[in-house]
């Protein structure tokens, strides 16, 4: 968990982010500025950078590491419809970041989904990033019947997007969506670590927050911060200021030591609960990682943290909170040892299993 954070921050802090434009030159596609289209997954619709997760007002006082990670576009998705027969994208990756245990497509690629005739989102294809440059222009699908379709384009998980254009064949339309899916009025907010940010999905659509979004048909706000889910009160206040969330999921344990959890969680929770007195809050234990079968120190550390969270939550319930749900760590990955890349960060298999177990709980809380 520490390695992914260290690599991320070394890269982000070494580069001064500048608003750069995608390269649209000498290409057979016509390009449409995606900033004019609805953007899902952001709590900063009026930010100076269109594709950020955090409002500008937080920058001055927020920890620099946390702010930098907030410029990663995890969980962001552009919604549109088009009658294109060929569709692609052009975008500028803010940092051109790479890691040795996660694909470039997951880190800084894009992932295109289409709404099928049954109203389900299905993958169409990934936009793989240029290995050598910040700029990428690529075609995702060609030779389609030119009819109107609804699309959702997931953005990069571990890099930022400075500019983005939808590419189509000449004469094709790119318009705002007609289908109201996913539902946006009452988003699900999920806060957590590098796992929640999407480490190490092979492509953006395979992060469990994005899978859950498609499964439950509700917008999901991804507040995953690699190595930095430290229960910063700035994040608690941001969640508190979000109108009408349907469910709030708190999943920060892998980034916390037990004393930090015990000291910080009560105030973090109380800020959110004061603003949203009846919104269901779902507390998620640390996963029971595969290496815990062998590494006794890790087993003891995680078991202690999970027990501390259970005690805190029991206290909140005893104080009268009837809108709390608890998700045990053994249910995150189940019994399958093939669910991680490095004993911590999830494979696509791990993300699918996690989503399949967590989504029904969230859906029940929404209906409740």
Annotate each language-model stretch with its function.
Residues 342-368:
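Histidine-centered active-site loop/cap adjacent to the catalytic His
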Residues 2-10:
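Sec-dependent signal peptide recognition
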Residues 185-209:
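Catalytic nucleophile-elbow at a beta strand-turn-alpha helix junction centered on a G-D-S/GDSL motif
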Residues 200, 204, 212, 230-275, ...:
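Oxyanion-hole/transition-state-stabilizing segment in secreted/luminal serine hydrolases
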Residues 209-222, 314:
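Short helix-loop-beta junction
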Residues 289-327, 353:
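Substrate-gating cap/lid alpha-helix
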Residues 4, 14, 19-187, 366-367:
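N-terminal secretory targeting modules
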Residues 99-102, 198-206, 299-303:
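Glycine- and acidic-residue-enriched helix-capping/strand-helix junction motifs
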